[in-house]
Every structure is written in structure tokens, then in C-alpha cells.
Amino acid sequence: EKRKQTLIAEGVIAVIAVIVGYAGYLFLTMTVEAPGGPENAGALGSEHSHAGILVKIFGDEFDFSAPAYQIKSPWIHFESRDGTTIHKHATGVELEYLFNSLSIGLDDECYVFPDGKSFCTNDEYSLKYFINDEPVSDIREYEIVEDDKILITFGGETPEQIQEYLSELRNQEIRK
């Protein structure tokens, strides 16, 4: 009887050892990926880049520092109640993923707020994008690199007003 109990105890210990060993193997070989991430993104932590952003709608600055826009994705986000610095934590993460995570629609003609209010290019007003002072037609597929500056405007701005916005953005601190 004692021998039987010893064999059972040894068997239980062996099973526990196998489980612990397997769990240890999985832990040591796992990647830092989380489900639901951006397509073609690298592992979390594969990059840490920062970019400044300024969004002006009819001259009014959009505030990403509100809690509704803070850390909505581990891959790319705003954090620390700062609405002017984008933090990217993996390679292959495009700006479209950031805006989707904030429930903001974005394409080459429209900027759509989470409440559905949209600002679309028409005969009087236009949506414009600038990356590092250069006009671009769309930013969705753009992947930020360290110290980028991104301007999004909607309205009927003069070239002088655009230059003022770009200057404001250039002087804006990127919080790292």
C-alpha cells in the first residue's frame, strides 16, 4: 500500500514537472505580440518612436489630451494626458491604425469625428495633410519615424495661415 502511494506521488510530481517545464518553455520562446494588432505590425516593443501632431479644424485645435483619446491601443497612442505627441511601440504601424483606434474616420477627403460629424473637402473648404512641412495627399499608410511633425487642417486657410500652423507645429515639444 505504501509503495502504491509512493508511485502515485511520484507520478503526480512528474506530471507537475512536465507542466512547469512546458510552461517555462512557452514563456521563454513567446513573442511579445498581442491579439487584434495592426496587420503587418512587428512585436510590441520592436520600436519606440515619437511624432508631434497638430489638428486644426476651421482654425480650432483638436485636443487629443482628453481621456477618450489616451492609450486606446498598445501599438500607437497618445499618453500622459498629452495630446500633441504620438507614441508608436512597434514597427509596421501606420497612422490609419491610430485614428481607427480613436474611432476617427480619415481618408484623402474627410475627417470624421467619433460622433459622426464629418469635415470633407468641398468647393469652399479642404482637408490638407502635411508631414515635416511637406504637403501629402493622404496619411493613412504613413508610418511615423522619430521626431516627425504631422499637420492636419480643414478649412479655407490661406497659404500664410498654413505657414503659421506649420511654424506652431515646428515649435511644439515632442514629449518622449
Which residues are covered by each model-predicted region?
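Ubiquitin-like/PB1-type beta-grasp interaction modules and other compact soluble beta-rich domains
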Residues: E1-K176
